[in-house]
Design a protein with these regions (language model features):
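N-terminal signal peptide
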Residues: 3-4, 12-26, 386-389
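Glycan-recognition patch characteristic of GH18 chitinases/ENGases
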Residues: 22-123, 149, 372-374, 380-383
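A cross-domain feature marking catalytic cores of carbohydrate-active enzymes
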Residues: 31-33, 55, 91-95, 135-137, ...
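Generic structural signal for well-ordered alpha-helices
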Residues: 73-80, 116-123, 157-168, 196, ...
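Glycan-binding loop/region signatures in secreted carbohydrate-active enzymes
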Residues: 93, 251-347, 377-389
Length: 389
């Protein structure tokens, strides 16, 4: 009887450990080459479950010959030494404007296999725990959408799941694989009811980029990372078959501002016409948009306006975002404060039962790391709620 009791106890403990591991919320940070800054405070690093080094260029994985070096701003070994044991270190491939490598890779069965073999070799050589595929975006609407029309990229919609499947096959089942995916529905060309289930077969999770939801392609003011627009993003993926527990909500550790031409936005600041912000022929920025991370110096020409934004800005309870309209400079400001970050946990993460969160990017929040603290606090709050259930 004693032996049987001990056997049951061991089984119970193993089950408890498995359940705890399975329900641990992901807290993913991108560490970027632009701001490769890691907090010195160990208590800020401890809640981070995954670190994604961004970026490695997609083109290098199309080489026929196996590479002897994998250029990135920080080695996996160095990154691992900075974080708690057990933190998963991933390599992010691609990024905004890096589409040609993916285009080449996805075209044929042979090119997909070559790309996948090289990705697997990189993971093995660097000691990474996995990869994040950041193709912006399969099917079109990327940086080059005026140069290469979407109809010329329509084939990528069916090729994208095939490329992911080939990478997963090469990596094997024990390495992590994620994808950073668009937050704006108009950019979700490759993420349909027909494709999402195929995509999710290859991935451990999706990083939904619920930021930059207002950009130069828009023509009215809105929150660039607001609650309602973020819910629209998450709901779109879930409606097309992505499980909630495989979705990570994106947070932006930076500001955005837009210079509005024409009528004043004083009476109706949200949804106010902005005027043209990109060249209709080339897609180039017309100089009416801007932004900076919390680590960057504030540009001199908007310093005074930004100070007013911090002092007089307000939170929109309906759309769920911090904003300010500067009437004097005709500037629309939109970003998350730590308080705005806190609100997203009950309204989105908890409400939709998401599997985790991520932020772009860790070093962008230096030196105060106020937004990281808010993100960590949200994670810890949800963990306590789960423990009490």
């Amino acid at each position: 009887m004693m032996t049987l009791s001990w056997q049951w106890l061991v089984m119970f403990l193993l089950l408890a450990m498995t359940t705890t591991s399975a329900t641990t919320m992901r807290n993913i940070m991108y560490l970027t080459g632009q701001h490769p800054i890691i907090p010195n405070d160990a208590s800020l690093r401890a809640p981070i479950t995954h670190l994604a080094l961004a970026f490695m260029n997609s083109n290098i994985f199309n080489n026929e010959q196996h590479s002897s070096s994998w250029p990135i701003f920080m080695s996996v070994e160095e990154a691992r030494s900075e974080f708690e044991p057990g933190t998963k270190i991933m390599v992010a491939i691609g990024g905004w404007g890096d589409t040609s490598g993916f285009d080449t890779a996805a075209r044929t069965e042979d090119s997909r296999a070559r790309f996948a073999r090289n990705v697997a070799s990189m993971v093995r050589d660097t000691g990474a725990d996995g990869v994040d595929i950041d193709w912006e975006y399969p099917g079109g609407n990327g940086e080059d959408y005026k140069e290469v029309p979407n109809e010329e990229k329509a084939w990528e919609i069916t090729a994208y799941p095939l490329l992911l499947a080939e990478i997963r096959k090469a990596l094997g089942p024990n390495k992590l694989m994620s994808a950073a995916v668009p937050g704006i529905p108009r950019d979700m060309l490759a993420f349909t009811a027909d494709t999402v289930s195929q995509i999710m077969e290859s991935l451990d999770f999706l990083n939904v980029m619920t930021y930059d939801l207002m950009n130069r392609r828009d023509n009215v003011t809105k929150h660039h990372t607001g609650v309602q627009l973020s819910l629209d993003s998450v709901n779109a993926y879930m409606a097309n078959g992505a499980p909630a527990d495989k979705i990570n909500l994106g947070f932006a550790f930076y500001t955005k501002y837009f210079r509005v031409e024409g009528e004043s936005c004083a009476e109706n600041p949200i949804g106010c016409p902005t005027g043209l912000m990109e060249d209709p022929e080339t897609g180039a920025d017309l100089g009416k948009t801007g932004g900076f991370s919390w680590h960057d110096d504030v540009p001199e020409d908007v310093r005074g306006s930004f100070e007013k934004t911090l002092d007089k800005g307000q939170y929109d309870e309906q759309g769920g975002g911090y904003w300010y309209w500067d009437e004097d400079q005709a500037l629309w400001w939109t970003f998350d404060t730590p308080a705005a970050i806190a609100k997203k946990f009950p309204l989105i993460v908890e409400e939709k039962r998401l599997g985790g969160v991520f932020a772009w990017g860790l070093g962008e929040d230096a030196p105060d790391f106020a937004h990281l603290k808010a993100l960590n606090a949200g994670i810890e709050r949800l963990a306590k709620i789960k423990d009490e259930l």
